[in-house]
């Protein structure tokens, strides 16, 4: 479809890995593949509907030509075929209208599903952020470019990862005058 070679695809994956990181790259790939599948489905639906419309239009044109040739002058066999053409054209028209009605509802449902999915992912991401990160994100999103926003998000992820293993020290600093030197403790134990 896009005529992308293996080397170009590999380059895109490496850039995606660098920009998004190993945690978010699979999620991004799944999201993009979902969009591609949705777009392909919509394109095939449109293509099928166009084909049916063209067939219907051709049938209607042939019917009009037959009517112009004066329907009574035709032989009985030809009049039967014209009637059959009219009946098949009417069947195709009703089927096409039903499919169009069904497609409109399914398209609306698909759009709602995609919106709900994006809203739920954004809500889970904001729930995971601390209030200070939310304030920082809210103030910087308006000013930063998408690349800078991605970099900032990556830095925030790294900070969350670091804070998991190295929690902040909330204790007050201990001064050297309050701590006994270890050499005195060792000497006291020997004595």
Swiss-Prot record:
Residues 119-139, 168-191 are annotated as: Disordered. Signal peptide: none annotated. GO terms for molecular function: protein transmembrane transporter activity. One of its GO terms (cellular component) is TAT protein transport complex. It comes from the Bacteria. Keywords: Cell inner membrane, Cell membrane, Membrane, Protein transport, Translocation, Transmembrane, Transmembrane helix, Transport. It is found in: Cell inner membrane. Residues 181-191 have a biased composition (Basic and acidic residues). It is a single-pass membrane protein. The chain crosses the membrane at residues 1-21. Residues 119-138 have a biased composition (Polar residues). The keyword tRNA processing does not apply. One of its GO terms (biological process) is protein transport by the Tat complex. Belongs to the TatB family. PANTHER family: SEC-INDEPENDENT PROTEIN TRANSLOCASE PROTEIN TATA, CHLOROPLASTIC. HAMAP family: TatB (MF_00237). Part of the twin-arginine translocation (Tat) system that transports large folded proteins containing a characteristic twin-arginine motif in their signal peptide across membranes. Together with TatC, TatB is part of a receptor directly interacting with Tat signal peptides. TatB may form an oligomeric binding site that transiently accommodates folded Tat precursor proteins before their translocation. The Tat system comprises two distinct complexes: a TatABC complex, containing multiple copies of TatA, TatB and TatC subunits, and a separate TatA complex, containing only TatA subunits. Substrates initially bind to the TatABC complex, which probably triggers association of the separate TatA complex to form the active translocon. This is Sec-independent protein translocase protein TatB.
């Amino acid at each position: 479809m896009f005529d992308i070679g293996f080397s170009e695809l590999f380059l895109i994956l490496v850039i995606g890995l660098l920009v998004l990181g190993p945690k978010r790259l699979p999620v991004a790939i799944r999201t993009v593949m979902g969009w591609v599948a949705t777009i392909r489905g919509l394109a095939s639906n449109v293509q099928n509907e166009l084909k049916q419309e063209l067939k219907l239009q051709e049938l209607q044109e042939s019917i009009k030509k037959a009517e112009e040739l004066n329907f009574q002058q035709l032989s009985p066999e030809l009049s039967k075929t014209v009637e059959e053409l009219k009946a098949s054209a009417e069947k195709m028209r009703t089927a096409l209208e039903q499919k169009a009605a069904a497609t409109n509802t399914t398209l609306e449902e698909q759009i709602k599903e995609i919106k709900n999915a994006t809203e739920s992912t954004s809500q889970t991401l904001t729930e995971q952020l601390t209030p200070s990160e939310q304030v920082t994100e809210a103030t910087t999103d308006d000013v930063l470019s998408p690349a800078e926003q991605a970099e900032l998000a990556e830095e925030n992820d790294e900070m969350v990862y670091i804070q998991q293993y190295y929690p902040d020290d909330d204790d007050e600093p201990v001064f050297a005058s309050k701590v006994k030197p270890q050499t005195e403790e060792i000497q006291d134990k020997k004595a």
